[in-house]
Amino acid sequence: MLSSTRYYASYRATLTKQLMFLTKADFTNDDEKWLNAFGNLLRQWFQIEDWKGNHKKLLDDLKRRDYL
């Protein structure tokens, strides 16, 4: 369990660095801003790509759960 927690923390730190670089914003201690920026990044990512099959199911699931 501890290793998965470390992995998650490392993964989130990496995503945060990437998001701060892309958005030029500092939101390391603000979960709402972080989630909004991540949602915007996902939204742009899905708009750029031509999603079919399982990717469309994933997008529909994210929209249904109000992540996008």
UniProtKB/Swiss-Prot annotation:
Function: C protein is one of the proteins involved in the production and packaging of viral single-stranded DNA.
Protein species of origin: Enterobacteria phage phiK (Bacteriophage phi-K)
Name of the protein described by the UniProt record: C protein
Highest taxon of the lineage: Viruses
InterPro entries listed in its UniProt record: C-protein
Single Gene Ontology BP annotation: viral DNA genome packaging
Species classification: Viruses, Monodnaviria, Sangervirae, Phixviricota, Malgrandaviricetes
This protein's encoding gene: C
Note: Phi KhT, a host-range mutant of phi K, can grow on E.coli C and B, besides K12, and is more thermosensitive than the parental phage phi K.
One Pfam family named in its UniProt record: Phage_C
